């Protein structure tokens, strides 16, 4: 398992992971919002600071996108959920941004326990996502190793 910086050629695999992970963990999205968010994400991801998790065969199995101290996105291929790739990506982000923050979906059942297990604490939230859609967010900030 290793981490490397993403390059433009990695974006298509990252989008594939995003789509698979979103389908597996964001069943609450309406079909219309899923299509809308997909288009927005596909337009945004090529400009993001992208970090990739690679398996033992050097295949990309997850990614994390950063914007300063903010973890903007973290998605792992559902086929390898629970194998430590997400944790490795977040720990890498914390080496670059020790005061990292993240906005996690309240409805994604695995997101909040995952971040809290790594030392993130709740600092607030909103009733909608950043585009005003009815998907509540929980704001978290890294408070140190639990």
Features from the language model and the residues they span:
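Conserved acetyl-CoA pyrophosphate-binding loop and the N-cap/start of the following alpha-helix
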Residues: 80, 84-92
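Conserved GNAT acetyl-CoA-binding A-motif
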Residues: 95-108
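Conserved active-site alpha-helix within GNAT-family acetyltransferase domains
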Residues: 87-88, 107-125, 131-134
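Conserved beta-hairpin
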Residues: 48-62
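A short helix-loop-beta-strand connector motif used in the catalytic cores of GNAT acetyltransferases and
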Residues: 41-52, 70, 133
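A short beta-loop-alpha structural element at the N-terminal edge
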Residues: 2-16
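Conserved GNAT-fold acetyl-CoA-binding loop/helix
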Residues: 15-41
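A short, internal acetyl-CoA/4′-phosphopantetheine-binding micro-motif in the GNAT/acyltransferase core
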Residues: 70-81, 105
């Amino acid at each position: 398992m290793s981490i490397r910086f993403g390059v433009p050629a990695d974006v298509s695999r990252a989008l594939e992971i995003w789509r698979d992970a979103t389908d597996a963990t964001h069943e609450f999205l309406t079909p219309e919002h899923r299509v809308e968010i997909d288009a927005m994400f596909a337009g945004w991801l090529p400009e993001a600071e992208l970090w990739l998790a690679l398996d033992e065969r050097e295949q990309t199995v997850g990614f994390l996108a950063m914007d300063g101290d903010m973890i903007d996105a973290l998605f792992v291929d559902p086929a390898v959920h629970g194998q430590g790739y997400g944790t490795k990506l977040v720990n890498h982000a914390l080496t670059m941004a020790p005061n990292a923050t993240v906005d996690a979906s309240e409805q994604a059942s695995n997101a909040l326990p995952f971040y809290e297990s790594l030392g993130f604490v709740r600092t607030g939230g909103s009733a909608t996502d950043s585009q005003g859609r009815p998907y509540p967010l929980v704001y978290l900030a890294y408070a140190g190793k639990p």
